Amino acid sequence: MWRTLRLNRWKVLCLLLGGAGLILHMFPHDLEWLAFIRQDDPTAECAHLRAAARALSYWGDFAGFNTIIFVTLGFFAFIRRSPFFRRMTIAAVLGTLLTGSLANVLRVSTGRARPASHLNPGFHGPSLSAKKHSFPSAHTATAFGASIPVAVAFPPAGMPMLLVSSGVAWSRMQNNCHHPSDVVTSILLSTLFGVPLGLMVRRSRSGSRRPA
């Protein structure tokens, strides 16, 4: 993975600079955009949306969505005796751990107030309070951290996972736990780690098919 990042360092730099610019542009508009995204009307339809958001957030964390992915991929690797699926499982685990760990370090370090915290909006500095762990979204980071490597390596399995991950990201905003920029930052971090991991798995499969 690190070799892939090094070989594509200019693309990585462009991603980092472009992503930083996007996030900085989003900060002043976060509350406005969050109000537009969230559906909080006292109607039956919105009640169903809120219930779906709660379910996605509950099952979309590391112990839920990610564990299901790891077990499913590992099961296929075992049943099919497939080195490809085994590598894909490892890539999903690494993507989750790398992205999730970085997201948690940033959350504790920046201390951004959650939208529902009733604290002054903004960054308050290092904090262990869950009310100040908004930036970035850990749920989104771990969900996309597992999905992106699989989507790059094996799209038929990865694309449905990306749809679920997108639902998890939406649920974090619908539940008033994160700002839009928190979610987008997590997706960018997942892309940074997930694409190289997925490419490694895909290339290893292509290499194994070459005739001797």
For each predicted feature, which ranges?
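Membrane-embedded catalytic cores of phosphoryl/pyrophosphoryl-handling enzymes
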Residues: 2, 119-212
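Membrane-helix interface segments
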Residues: 48, 81-87, 154-159
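Transmembrane helix-loop junctions in multipass membrane proteins, especially transporters and channels
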Residues: 78-85, 108-116, 177-181, 202-207
